[in-house]
Amino acid sequence: DSMQVYRGMDIGTAKPTECERNRVSHHLFDLVNPDETYSVGRFVRESEEVIKKLKLRKKIPILVGGTGMYLRSLLFGLSQIPEVSSNIKLQVKKWQKEEGTPACWQKLKEVDPEGAEKLHPNDTSRIMRALEVVISSGQPISSFQHNDNSNAQRYPFYGMICDRPRQELYDRINQKTLEMMDQGWIDEVRKLLARYPENLKPFQSIGYREIIQFLRGELESSDLVPLIQQRTRQYAKRQLTWFRKENHLVWSHPDKKEQILKECMVC
């Protein structure tokens, strides 16, 4: 998961509990501080190291998460996206500074509607990256990502998507948000802000961004939880749209444990 690598961001990223970690070994958690950079390239390299070690111990690695690009890059290799000149990067940075991230998202929507649909209008770094690529190459970033998906699969793999009815999924999201609030999510954010500036990229993720707005007095307490729930549901919808285009994945309701286990054994 792209957010669970950050130390101190525990409740809001739904990291495994200490009890769960004691029952089975977990990897690639708490690798960097929120003010450090973590990339898909680093994820692939570190995942490959973990997989090698587990194979030597005759263990089968299980990957869990919802960051589609991370999974695709591990299975099929990193996207061969062309280099972007410093001039174009400066131009996009100027747009973002002068017009704001939502305006940049609108620009992206005009030239790469598919790519824009996958991103939240406030996801500054990914929006800027997508704009840089389309301006530099004349092609949307999604075209490079789709092309790379035709590469040979690098590992034998059985992939499953939890296929819940939409209302059941949304109900679980709403309940999970309430549980995370009860666990002290707001206090977690307060502690993070005591150590780090609020404009860091990880703090733009869903929930953290809204809690920061609440702590700044820009969001009423009565609006906080419903807004996080809404944006999480929207993100889940975008995730499902992404994964529907991944032909190597099987869709199954997680309650069908025997069927899932049987299919895994066949693979």
Identify what each model region corresponds to.
Residues 2-267:
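Phosphate/pyrophosphate-binding catalytic cores of soluble transferases and nucleic-acid-acting enzymes
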